[in-house]
A protein has these predicted regions:
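Post-Walker A alpha-helix
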Residues: 149-150
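Short charge-dense sequence patches
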Residues: 53-67, 97-103, 224-232, 252-260
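Conserved lysine of the Walker
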Residues: 146
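Sterically constrained small-residue positions within well-ordered secondary structures
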Residues: 32-34, 64, 120, 218, ...
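Extreme N-terminal, non-catalytic leader segments
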Residues: 74-77, 83-132
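Glycine-rich, often acidic-flanked micro-motifs
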Residues: 2-26, 127, 131-141, 156-333
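Aromatic pocket-lining residues of Rossmann-like dinucleotide-binding sites
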Residues: 153
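Long, basic/Gly/Ser/Thr-rich N-terminal segments
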Residues: 1-94, 98, 307-333
Length: 333
């Protein structure tokens, strides 16, 4: 374990010590008196040849090995990662052509997510934003528009709590995580940003990072007020329900949808955290309303629509689906 002196990074209520790899996406923190009670995470390069063998497990894949307290991840043509006991991430660069940013991209996703799961955290795949001391979490499949929504809300006075990985404490607080937003080239242009002035998330990709001064971030854990499942929908459809926020009232449907938004369910199962994760999701479902959030196609239309919404209250006050839709939810759940 590293000592807690000097310059470190901070996220998810933890101190991250990475002397060999700069991780600019994580906020810097100068450790002072009274900070010794914060858990410190060690991030270091390490040759995989020295890693002990793991017995084959039921959740292994060609690129993943999992045992209790030990997860190994191989990213083709990038590198390998080993996450142990919720306190350490070892990384190995596949070859000299792999940049530090390439390593950071995967380290801050699957590796950090695995470490949080090892520590017993409930981790959702989404974005978290704060306003007036309360948080919302927006979830959805890859490409649903989570990052675009996060940036649009930030332009309307919200502050970013976390991107991609959202960790929720047992008492329902959303922890400040990784304060960055990733935008594709077209989205960056639509927000009047110059992609040439933004670092790409990986070499050769037309997806860019907004971090540091480009992001208004929240720095304190805050209560979770609402959960949203986002999807793109044309608001000129004749269906009157298409443009309204709909609360998911079926307990069975809500449980299934929340479970599907947990970060890397295979990690959860392989690390032996499924029971703990199930209880955390059930507790979250009982406390926080879940609703679908239909985003208009096009950034300008989405921004205009969002200005008319009160997302802190909308999930709780929204009506449920029509009876026929409720029946369909029960069948699919």
């Amino acid at each position: 374990m590293p000592g807690v002196t000097g310059q470190h990074r901070e996220a998810f209520g933890l101190i991250w010590h990475s002397p060999a790899l700069d991780i600019p996406e994580l906020p810097e923190r100068l450790i002072g008196p009274g900070s010794g009670d914060r858990a410190a995470i060690d991030i270091a390069p390490e040759a995989p040849e020295g890693w002990p063998d793991l017995p084959p497990g039921p959740h292994d894949t060609p690129f993943l090995q999992i045992a209790r307290g030990d997860l190994r991840l191989t990213v083709e043509d990038i590198g390998r990662f080993r996450i142990t006991d919720g306190v350490r991430i070892a990384w190995h660069r596949q070859h000299s052509g792999v940049s530090d940013q390439d390593i950071c991209t995967f380290l801050l996703g699957s590796a950090v997510g695995a470490l949080l799961i090892q520590r017993g955290s409930l981790v959702l795949h989404g974005n978290a934003l704060e306003k007036d001391g309360q948080a919302i979490v927006c979830m959805g499949h890859s490409g649903a528009g989570k990052s675009t929504l996060a940036y649009a809300l930030m332009q309307q006075g919200w502050r970013l709590l976390a991107d991609d990985l959202v960790a929720i404490s047992p008492d329902g607080l959303v922890l400040p995580g990784i304060p960055r937003i990733k935008l594709w080239h077209d989205a960056a242009k639509a927000f009047d940003l110059d992609p040439l002035q933004l670092p790409p998330i990986r070499q050769g990709m037309h997806k860019y990072l907004l971090m540091g001064e480009a992001v208004q971030r929240a720095t304190e854990a805050v209560p979770l007020q609402a959960l949203y499942l986002i999807h793109q929908h044309r608001h000129d459809t004749p269906d009157p329900d298409a443009s309204r926020i709909i609360r998911i009232t079926s307990q069975k449907a809500a449980a299934l949808r929340l479970r599907n938004q947990a970060f890397r369910p295979r990690f959860v199962r392989g690390l032996g955290q499924e029971g703990l994760n199930f209880m955390a999701l059930a507790r979250l479902q009982s406390r926080v309303p879940l609703a679908s959030l239909p985003l208009p196609a096009g950034i300008a239309a989405m921004q205009d629509w969002l200005e008319r919404q009160d997302l802190l209250q909308a999930a709780a006050t929204a009506e449920g689906p029509a009876l026929a839709q409720q029946d369909a939810e029960m069948v699919t759940a």
